[in-house]
Amino acid sequence: MADHMMAMNHGRFPDGTNGLHHHPAHRMGMGQFPSPHHHQQQQPQHAFNALMGEHIHYGASNMNASSGIRHAMGPGTVNGGHPPSALAPAARFNNSQFMGPPVASQGGSLPASMQLQKLNNQYFNHHPYPHNHYMPDLHPAAGHQMNGTNQHFRDCNPKHSGGSSTPGGSGGSSTPGGSAGTSGGGAGSSNSGGGSGGGSSSNMPASVAHVPAAVLPPNVIDTDFIDEEVLMSLVIEMGLDRIKELPELWLGQNEFDFMTDFVCKQQPSRVSC
């Protein structure tokens, strides 16, 4: 291995006869510049090495491995065994395509953050404020919340707004900055100041952000209460009214034991030996 490195160093460094190639940093090519003369000679070759280094890298290594010749083998292998792109690591990385990804990542972080912001706005539109689009119909005075801090939430999904046609309006208002106009739904009408946006003619506090589920329209999925008659019919059909314990308590046991106990409790007149 040492002979191989020495032979490559004789072909690599032009000042190999003055003993500089015996230095470990110069021998391995680990320094930023192996020597001043070597840097001056390799400086015009940086463009060639950056362009042709990746294409000749494997070819030069294979030729050297097969033929055993460690010196120059053509215009592409002027460094004698090393691929032309195998300069000092700092010199190679500063003049090749390796500087591209950091710059691209800095430029690409902005669209990625914008996409995340868009997704976050859509997420927060549905989860922390799930009933904002029903508030203008139920509580007209609470419609000013759509104009304040939650303006961008309403702008993300305009279909949830109360029917405004201009930016800044909510409920039924048609003027920019209006807090809440006349809203339908049997909730009455209230005209509050457009400049302040905090005027309220309702007794309900304006800071209420969540409307109770009981006052929401019945078509909301959260307010689809199960009918007691339907529930009792299911209980009677399954025979749950004839047993003393619910079947959920038996789910941790074996399926066979559960089925036998369940059948025995459903048929109390059955004689079991």
UniProtKB/Swiss-Prot annotation:
| InterPro entries assigned to the protein according to its UniProt record, in alphabetical order | CITED
> A single Gene Ontology molecular function, please?
RNA polymerase II-specific DNA-binding transcription factor binding
Q: Where would you find this protein in the cell? A: Nucleus
Q: Nuclear export signal: where is this motif?
A: 1
Q: How does it assemble?
A: Interacts (via C-terminus) with SMAD2. Interacts (via C-terminus) with SMAD3 (via MH2 domain). Interacts with LHX2 (via LIM domains). Interacts with WT1. Interacts (via C-terminus) with EP300 (via CH1 domain); the interaction is stimulated in response to hypoxia. Interacts with PPARA. Interacts (via C-terminus) with TFAP2A, TFAP2B and TFAP2C.
Give the family this protein belongs to, as stated in its UniProt record: Belongs to the CITED family.
Q: What is this protein called?
A: Cbp/p300-interacting transactivator 2
Query: Whose protein is this, by species?
Result: Bos taurus
